[in-house]
């Protein structure tokens, strides 16, 4: 049995076959990128009716971008994982995609919307890194634009010991994913194991470990306001963890 490991911290790895399996696994769990992109575009337009451009930070394999391109004249992405970015580039050959870190990127232009979805923000290690990322988001959004962030669970909403499991099959490959979540200080530790099987490949085993910070709602709001953005939290969202929206030019406002 082959064994590989990818460990994600503030620089989440998401490399090798884990990156290749990413979309198959999450779509098998019911993630609907098309619907999420449509809802996200509607949210952006609610705050910025003339929005024409969007930057997706931590764009992963570019699944959201593929659908967002139908709603905005210009879409760009930023991704830390080189392997995830390579998949995104294959999927979105006409989009400009950047290899970079949400804590310190500088693209030299602004967008109608800056988004960071699927709780990618949780890979940051603490308040200083969260503040740095929101400052970068604010620096890349137009004065009449909007910043949208999907958080990880708040501490009071996290379920220690949570186990998730599922099996998906596509193109002759079967993947079973099992994860276990535990509390590790002010963060979630998620251990994930995959069994991947196919007629010609046999069975391989892969595992990854992620530490995802359990920021409080107040910590997110502090980062938004420090970056000069008003902030509003909306319950629900794509994964049930809610969404934060921020508008430029209203430092210190929380709604």
Curated annotation (Swiss-Prot):
S-adenosyl-L-methionine binds at residues 14, 22, 33, 58-59, 79, 101-102, 117. Pathway: Antibiotic biosynthesis; tylosin biosynthesis. Its EC number is 2.1.1.235. It is an enzyme of class 2 (transferase). Disulfide bonds: none annotated. One of its GO terms (biological process) is antibiotic biosynthetic process. The keyword S-adenosyl-L-methionine applies. Pfam families: Methyltransf_25. Keywords: Antibiotic biosynthesis, Methyltransferase, S-adenosyl-L-methionine, Transferase. Changing residue 123 to A/N: Strongly reduced activity. Belongs to the methyltransferase TylM1/DesVI family. This is dTDP-3-amino-3,6-dideoxy-alpha-D-glucopyranose N,N-dimethyltransferase. The gene is tylM1.
């Amino acid at each position: 049995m082959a064994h590989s490991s990818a460990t994600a911290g503030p620089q989440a790895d998401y490399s090798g076959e884990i990156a290749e399996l990413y979309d198959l696994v999450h779509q098998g769990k019911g993630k609907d990128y098309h619907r999420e992109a449509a809802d996200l575009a509607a949210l952006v337009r609610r705050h910025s009716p003339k929005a024409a451009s969007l930057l997706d930070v931590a764009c992963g394999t570019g699944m959201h971008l593929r659908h967002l391109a139908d709603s905005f004249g210009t879409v760009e992405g930023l991704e830390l994982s080189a392997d995830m970015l390579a998949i995104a580039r294959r999927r979105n050959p006409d989009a400009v995609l950047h290899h970079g870190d949400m804590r310190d990127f500088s693209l030299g232009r602004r967008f109608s919307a800056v988004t960071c979805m699927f709780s990618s923000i949780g890979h940051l290690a603490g308040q200083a890194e969260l503040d740095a990322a929101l400052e970068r988001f604010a620096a890349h959004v137009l004065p009449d634009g909007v910043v949208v962030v999907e958080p990880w669970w708040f501490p009071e909403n996290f379920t220690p010991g949570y186990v998730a499991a599922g099996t998906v099959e596509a193109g002759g490959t079967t993947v079973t994913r099992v994860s276990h979540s535990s509390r590790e200080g002010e963060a979630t530790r998620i251990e994930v194991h995959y069994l991947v099987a196919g007629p010609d490949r046999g069975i391989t085993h892969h595992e990854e470990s992620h530490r995802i910070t359990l920021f409080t709602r107040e910590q997110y709001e502090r980062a938004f306001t420090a970056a000069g953005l008003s902030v509003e939290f909306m319950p629900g969202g794509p994964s049930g963890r809610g969404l934060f929206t921020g508008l430029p030019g209203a430092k210190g406002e929380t709604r």
